[in-house]
Amino acid sequence: VSTALEWLECAWLNPFDSDAARAHSSYNGLHGGELMRLLDTAPATPFAHVANAAFRAFVLDDDFSCLGAKSSLRRDTYRLGAYARLDDPGVTEGLARDLYAFAAERHGFESDFTTFIAVFREREHASEEAFERALWSQLQRLHDLDARYHAWDARVSDDPNDPRFSFSVAGNAFFVVGLHPAASRVSRRFAWPTLVFNAHEQFEQLRADGRFTGLQTQIRKRELRLEGALNPNLSDYGRHSEARQYSGRPTGDAWQCPFKAKR
């Protein structure tokens, strides 16, 4: 989508158009420095404003390690959704609606770094294990709904045990980063449960341009300074499944991903 008109046309064709999808949708972006809802005329909710300010402060802190995230927030090439509960089935339809809009709109940002941030108001996961279960439960429901309309992105695998796995929604592959208050790692410890969706193709573009390795090295150096050790789940795409990295919880060899794609 390269023009505002084309983006609006895609938004009008959004297949996630049920009453529940509209009720739970919360697609927000900055316009003139003000947070606004972009799929309807309602104002951004108070929680959306608070979550947006908190997330910007979290990522733009000098110690935060992910340089791509910093770039996206500085350039305002991100969208933010504010929802009730991560493990609420009703939220899934609104999240699907907003992710479809983001997949359609992100190409118009003309930036190497774009991201969709889904923040959930209810803090009900007292452990990393509880958050991980809620994360995969929501991704499973999201996929089950999305599979009615879209095939899995053919550039990646739908098998979470495959080193080529990446989560797909609206026909687009995403690397998902989970954040929550109970995270053991500082870089994953945020005030509310949060899922960050980063388009897989932007990493592939960085590789094609020869910039990925240098950026990765800088990020890992910053992570080492912040945490004292790298996340044991870290691996390069194509060597091990990225599914292990989504929740941020260290996983052992016996870990099994609960996600199963429809075929």
Predicted regions: what is each one?
Residues V1-S111, R123, A134-W152, R207-R263:
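Non-catalytic accessory regions used for complex assembly or targeting
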Residues G81, Q138, V177-L179, V196-N198:
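Active-site ExK catalytic segment of metal-dependent nucleases
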Residues H180-K221:
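Compact mixed alphabeta submodule
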Residues D112-I117:
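Non-heme Fe(II)/2-oxoglutarate
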Residues A118-R121, N198:
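Conserved beta-strand segments of the P-loop GTPase G domain that flank and frequently precede/overlap
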Residues A154-A191:
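Aromatic/basic-lined ligand-recognition segments
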Residues R123-S127, A182-A183:
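Short acidic, S/G/P-rich loop/turn micro-motifs used as interaction or catalytic elements
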Residues F120, E129-R133:
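Polyanion-binding catalytic cores of nucleic-acid enzymes and NTP/SAM-utilizing transferases
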